[in-house]
Each structure stands twice: as structure tokens, then as C-alpha cells.
């Protein structure tokens, strides 16, 4: 585990990282003071930028993780069909809404400027919450979503464009929605029947 404060030009080892632990995914709080780490050996750890990492027992091992991009105290996690929320900078998590019948949540993406607005791509579809993950709405006609990202909106003062590698109405492809998933036009790019997250 290493940290950079200059856009990746240089890196400094985290002084509190445990020995022999590597890999996995990291989520950093909106203010940069808290780090949540889903490690390569399926541990869930949390720390500040200098303190020793401690295990998070209230989030299942191997969970998909993310941070809210506006609320520095909020982190998200997903495991199976369950979604989890932390309001204390990743120290503890409580269960929130459900992700249908999903068993593989692939990615959690938070709105860049609106707290509590979060998306989850899973093996059974694409899910959206506007209340910090307390409840979710499934996006219509999406039966599988391997990846999701939010990008620049099509015009000023609009919701971010949603890009998804997904299966919509039975057709796999790269899709874009410009109205928060209300409608998803024909796919952009190559079509396919399967993909990997």
C-alpha cells in the first residue's frame, strides 16, 4: 500500500499497512483522510493516511467497495445481493437496500457532486439509489452489467452520462444513457454475448 499526493508522480509507502498484505481494491474518502482496503486475500481494512490499518468486521470479506464523492464520512460496500453503508468513515457498516437476486456485484460508482447518489453493476442488472443505498431501483431491461462509469453530461446542468458494459434487452454492448437510465439507446461499439468484469 502506497500513497501519492502529487497525481502519481511519487509514492510513499503507507506506514500503517500490515506486512504480507497486497493487492485488492482501495477506496479513499472524499476529503482524502480515510482509506478502505479490500485486500487481495479478502480482508477488509480501514485506516487514516498514517494510522495502522484495522479489520472491518461488519463488512463481508471480499466485498466490492467505494466511497461517496461528496460526503467524506460515507463509504459503500456490496456482497451478494446485499448493500452496506458506513457513515463513520468505514469503521462500521450497516446493511442497506438489496440488489435484486444478484450474487456478484461488480462495481459501485458514486455521483461526483451529489451525496448519496450511487450506482451498482451486477450479474443481474444495474441498480440506482439516491438515498445513500437505503433502497435501490433496478434499471429496466438490463439483465447484466459488467461495468459502469459516469461521464460528462450531454449538456449543462444535466445528470452525468452513464456508460455501461451491459446486456440490455438481451443484447450485450457498450451503452450510454443521458437521462439517468430512464432510457438506454442502442449500444455503442461492438456487440457481444458475454464479458468479464
Over which residues does each language-model region extend?
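Hydrophobic beta-strand positions in blades of beta-propellers and related beta-sheet-rich domains
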Residues: 1, 41-45, 83, 126-127, ...
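Structural signature of eukaryotic scaffold interfaces centered on beta-propeller domains
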Residues: 25-31, 64-70, 107-114, 147-157, ...
Amino acid at each position: 500500500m502506497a500513497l501519492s499526493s502529487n497525481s502519481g508522480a511519487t509514492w510513499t509507502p503507507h506506514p500503517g499497512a500490515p506486512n504480507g498484505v497486497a493487492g485488492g481494491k482501495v477506496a479513499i474518502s472524499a476529503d482524502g483522510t480515510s482509506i478502505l482496503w479490500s485486500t487481495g486475500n479478502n480482508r477488509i481494512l480501514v485506516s487514516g493516511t498514517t494510522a495502522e490499518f484495522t479489520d472491518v468486521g461488519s463488512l463481508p470479506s471480499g466485498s466490492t467497495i467505494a466511497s461517496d464523492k461528496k460526503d467524506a464520512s460515507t463509504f459503500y460496500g456490496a456482497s451478494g445481493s446485499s448493500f452496506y453503508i458506513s457513515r463513520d468513515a468505514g469503521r462500521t457498516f450497516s446493511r442497506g437496500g438489496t440488489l435484486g437476486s444478484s450474487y456478484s456485484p461488480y462495481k459501485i460508482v458514486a455521483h461526483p457532486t451529489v451525496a448519496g447518489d450511487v450506482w451498482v453493476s451486477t450479474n443481474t442488472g444495474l441498480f440506482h439509489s439516491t438515498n445513500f443505498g437505503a433502497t435501490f431501483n433496478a434499471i429496466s431491461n438490463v439483465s447484466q452489467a459488467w461495468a459502469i462509469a459516469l461521464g460528462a453530461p450531454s449538456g449543462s446542468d444535466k445528470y452525468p452520462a452513464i456508460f455501461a458494459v451491459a446486456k440490455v434487452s438481451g443484447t450485450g454492448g457498450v451503452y450510454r444513457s443521458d437521462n439517468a437510465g430512464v432510457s438506454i439507446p442502442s449500444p455503442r461499439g461492438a456487440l457481444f454475448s458475454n464479458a468479464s468484469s
